[in-house]
Curated annotation (Swiss-Prot):
Residues 228-249 are cytoplasmic. Glycans are attached at N64, N81, N93, N96, N143. The chain crosses the membrane at residues 207-227, 250-270. GO terms for cellular component: endosome membrane; Golgi apparatus; late endosome. This is Putative mannose 6-phosphate receptor-like protein C530.09c. It is found in: Golgi apparatus, trans-Golgi network membrane; Endosome membrane. Belongs to the MRL1/IGF2R family. It comes from Schizosaccharomyces pombe (strain 972 / ATCC 24843). GO terms for biological process: late endosome to vacuole transport; protein transport; vacuolar transport. It is a multi-pass membrane protein. Disulfide bonds join C44-C87, C147-C183, C163-C195.
């Protein structure tokens, strides 16, 4: 019987472990368990195709909850400033503007400039995947407003990212470099987020591994014991629980301890209250005596 119970528990444990491994994508390494990673690059981040270095630009995103709003870029001799966001549509309120140039979707504009206060031109739809061209980390925004004097060519933007670790400069500096025929715009973005970093390791720490094994062992014990009690011993109800008598005795023991502690606390509280009242009476008596001495 004991051998049969052990075999059932082992089979249940192996089955549960394989289910955990498939569900969470766990792989066994020398350092422990590691979560299997997808082949796709993370959002707004990438690895260098040659060096394998990891670059994460997600820290530059300005979403609807950001108090800073879109990035404002000085246009210098272009005559107007630009508003740009990264890996997210612009968060500026565009309802007061007239979007020119037959833009397909105003909700996905990634950058724009305005003319005469109310005419808005999109310089590209929001892009979400940076990429490398040689050693240059860039992001390209396409499908903006129609270019001047064109019925099919649309405005686009090219952003070149440069690593900037200088602690004495602004954490993010965007510079307008120039444009081609008021149709293609070029910006340089200096930021520490463009520097290679280390991707967060997805290896489970020893505590997580220990807790995972404990959970699998407990489930294997419970499932295997339940099957054994029901199939072999024909148990029903609560007696299907493995080692039901042991758990019942343990629960009764814990209940007795709780009742004893509760009764002990209740027996201590009245004496403490009585002592506090006695101390208060003594204080009142001393105060009355001092007042009488002062009056005499």
């Amino acid at each position: 019987m004991r051998l049969l119970t052990c075999l059932i528990n082992v089979l249940a444990g192996l089955t549960l472990f394989s289910q955990f491994q498939r569900a969470f994508g766990l792989t066994i390494t020398r350092r422990g368990f590691k979560v299997q990673e997808s082949d796709e690059e993370p959002f707004c981040a990438l690895h260098h195709p040659n060096t394998g270095e990891y670059f994460d630009l997600s820290g530059l995103i300005r979403d609807n909850t950001s108090e800073k709003g879109d990035y404002s870029v000085n246009g210098y001799d272009f005559g107007t400033n630009f508003s740009i966001n990264l890996c997210h549509p612009v968060v500026s309120n565009l309802t007061n503007y007239t979007v020119e140039g037959d833009v397909s979707s105003e909700d996905s504009i990634g950058g724009f400039f305005t003319v005469e206060d109310d005419d808005l031109y999109s310089i590209g739809q929001a892009a979400y995947k940076p990429y490398f061209r040689g050693k240059k980390l860039i992001m390209q925004l396409d499908n903006g407003s129609l270019c001047p004097k064109s019925n099919h060519i649309r405005m686009s933007t090219l952003i070149s990212f440069t690593c900037n670790r200088d602690p004495y400069t602004a954490p993010s500096v965007i510079t307008y470099v120039g444009n081609l025929n008021d149709c293609a715009f070029f910006f340089e973005w200096k930021t520490i987020h463009a520097c290679p970093t280390v991707k967060k390791d997805s290896t489970l720490n020893p505590v997580s591994v220990f807790l995972l094994f404990c959970a699998i062992a407990f489930l294997a014990y419970f499932v295997g014991g339940f099957v054994y009690q029901r199939v072999v011993l024909n148990a029903r109800g609560l007696r299907q629980i493995p080692n039901y008598e042991m758990w019942r005795s343990l629960f009764g023991f814990i209940s007795d301890i709780v009742i004893i502690l509760y009764s002990s606390i209740l027996s201590i509280l009245p004496s403490s209250i009585t002592r506090m009242r006695g101390n208060r009476r003594n204080i009142d008596y001393v105060e009355d005596a001092l007042i009488d001495d002062i009056d005499t």
